[in-house]
Amino acid sequence: MEEFFQQLTNGLAVGGIYALIALGYTMVYGVLKLINFAHGDLFTIGAFLGLTLLTSLGLTDAIGPVAGLILLAVMVVILVGVVGFLLERIAYRPLRTSPRLSAVVSALGASIFFQNAIMLIWGARPLVYPHGLLPNITVSILGVELPLIRILMFAISVVLMCALYYLTHKTRIGTAIRAAAIDQGAAKLMGIDVNRVISLVFMIGPALGGAAGVMVGLYYGQISFTMGWLYGLKAFTAAILGGIGNIPGAMLGGLLLGVVESLGAAYISIAWKDAISFLVLILILIVRPTGLLGERVADKV
């Protein structure tokens, strides 16, 4: 039972990361009906920016580990949000009225550009986050000792997801985002600046991905310029699992995928960890193509 609880909490922590990245996919798809294939690379940029700021500014030494890491995360969120904004303005907006394939090619090109830019700036070898930034202590929950960083990762993910849900469902900005996702033409007639909404979506999604990148660096300790490919693919799987375009669905899909992956690695084989994730994707596409929380689509005859 203790082993099961350990794997469950590990799955929730990793699933929170998948969920944060998946939210970027699902927000862009909800508004533009477009898959941002460069989103995983924005997550990678967040991880590398976090390492650079951490080592160059010495925030944890100046203001303490907890306050330093919080300030670091805020800085990364802002910087990656700006990169996402520029990506939309340069790679997507000029092609908005072009055939859908043009935007897909542009997204793939942006992904290749980001990977090579990361490699040129930080090098091709994996980099390591500093050790010992947080106290190496455990917290006892239901008689099971859990690492503090695992609990913090899950808590931060939940806070960010709740903040996004509040933004999209309880504010005027969120109402504008949801209106643009339903019908851009009608949203324009209602006085909503759709271009501004799309830019905002491209800032929020990558910002969450950047925060996830920092958490991955702190949790696993090592980052590489290709890490966004696998994490992006799994987050895309999570978005489809929950229902692409559905924000609560992306949250649920990420957490479920993390738990299934963690339990599968523990009780089946760690060699099958990635395969289990994509097997879940295949099964959900067969059983419920619109995802767990996606709306069923039916043609009236």
Segments (PLM) and residue ranges:
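Membrane-embedded helix boundary and interhelical linker motif in transport proteins
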Residues: V31-L86, I90
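Hydrophobic alpha-helical segments within and immediately flanking transmembrane helices
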Residues: V14-Y25, A38-L59, L87, V105-S106, ...
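Short, non-helical or kinked segments that cap or interrupt transmembrane helices
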Residues: Y25-F48, T97-S102, I173-A176, V194, ...
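Short loop segments and helix-boundary regions at transmembrane helix junctions
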Residues: G30-A38, V82-R125, L167-G174, A179, ...
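Inter-helical junctions in multi-pass inner-membrane proteins, predominant
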Residues: E2-I17, L167-T168, R172, I198-A239, ...
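Membrane-interfacial amphipathic/re-entrant helices at transmembrane-helix boundaries
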Residues: M1-I21, L49, T60-L71, S98-A103, ...
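Transmembrane helix-bundle core of multi-pass membrane transporters
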Residues: P94-L95, R100-K170, V197, G221, ...
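Helix-loop-helix "hairpin" substructures at the membrane interface of multi-pass membrane proteins
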Residues: V14, E145-I223, I247-G253
